[in-house]
Amino acid sequence: MEQHPLLTDIKYLNVPNICFSLTEETDNREPIYSEQRQLRGFDDSETWSLTDTICLFILPRLQRFKEINASTPAQLTEKEWNDILDKIIISLQLTCKDRGLRIWTEEESKQINEGLDLFREWFMALWW
C-alpha cells in the first residue's frame, strides 16, 4: 500500500530546520516540489533565495555549536573565540532577518560583512 505523499514528504513532518521550501500546499507546483523533496531532500524553491536557505540552515546549528563547543582554536582565548562566533551569528541573523528584502542600515551591512569575513576565515575551525 502506497503512503500518502504528505506522510513521506519532509515538508509535512513538522520537524524543525530540515525543510526550507518556500511553496504553499495550494501552489500548483507543489506536487512536483513534493516529489523533488522525497527524491533528494529539498525542492527547487529552496534555491529561489539560497542566501536565506543557507542562513536558516546554518544559524541554529552555529548557535548550538557555540553552546556546546568544547574547544577553542589554539591561537585564541575562549573569549576571543566566543566573540568571533557571536559576530558570525549576528551576521547570519541580520542576513536572513527580512526574508530576502536586503534592507539593512549601514551599521548592519558592516556587521554582516565583518561576520561573513570571520565565517570564511574561521570556517575550518568549526569543529570540536
Locate the predicted segments by residue.
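Long, non-globular targeting/processing and low-complexity regions
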Residues: 1-128
